Amino acid sequence: MSVPNEPDSSLAMHSWNLTPQQAIEVQKQLAVQTVRTGNPEGVQRVAGVDVSFNPREPKALVHAVVVVLSYPGLEVVDRQAVSAAVDFPYIPGLLSFREAPPILAAIGQLSQKPDLVIVDGHGYAHPRRLGIASHLGLFLDLPTIGCAKSILVGRADGDLAEAAGSLTDLLWRGEVVGRAVRTRSRVQPVYVSPGHRLGLDSAVEWVLRCCRGYRLPEPTRQAHNYSNLVRKARQPISLNGLSGAK
């Protein structure tokens, strides 16, 4: 999708210029708007989103990338990156207020719109049920999945078998908020939760469909690799005027 002259209303749900306490209140308000049912149909393009940064960088640069893959072929058809200095502090549970503006700016530069987005991060498995995958899903009005490398809240409900495709629920405060998913035999699992416009079962199915023998599903694996390249090479830009960065 090309960058519009004026931001789409779906990309202007709230200001990003917030204090941490204000950000928490926004999360509480938005969490009730997420839809955790359904299964995307007619998917032809799946995007992976990842962010990298170097904590030793004095300007706190965030390097956000989106990589779009064909489906079911899983070949890269588009990718974009935005590197920008951000002011919001690094606070677990509030990372979307640091990372979403450059992510949305990168997505706004795509020539091919994805039908489904897999985010390196959490969705419903979040202290206020609004991880970055859920937050992005609401802004983009697209089905989104959180696929994280570590647990933010909760614990696995029992042992997870070593075989690829093994699953166990992720429980927090008596509720199933996600699943631990073994995507490769005898390798650490990923932690999957719905972001927006699909259910947990569908989120897990899509992650497994997008795997190619690595721990990470191919969309976020490609995004992870690209974000590291960008981190080593890119210079910061201003987010002003870029789609989705308001």
From Swiss-Prot:
E.C. code: 3.1.21.7
Function: DNA repair enzyme involved in the repair of deaminated bases. Selectively cleaves double-stranded DNA at the second phosphodiester bond 3' to a deoxyinosine leaving behind the intact lesion on the nicked DNA.
Pfam families: Endonuclease_5
Cofactor requirement: Mg(2+)
Record protein name field: Endonuclease V
UniProt entry tagged with the keyword Electron transport: no
Origin organism lineage: Bacteria, Bacillati, Cyanobacteriota, Cyanophyceae, Gloeobacterales
Reaction(s) catalysed (UniProt annotation): Endonucleolytic cleavage at apurinic or apyrimidinic sites to products with a 5'-phosphate
Keyword Nuclease on entry: yes
GO molecular function, one term: RNA endonuclease activity, producing 5'-phosphomonoesters
EC primary class: hydrolase
A single GO cellular-component term on record: cytoplasm
Family: Belongs to the endonuclease V family.
GO BP: DNA repair
Subcellular location: Cytoplasm
UniProt keyword list: Cytoplasm, DNA damage, DNA repair, Endonuclease, Hydrolase, Magnesium, Metal-binding, Nuclease
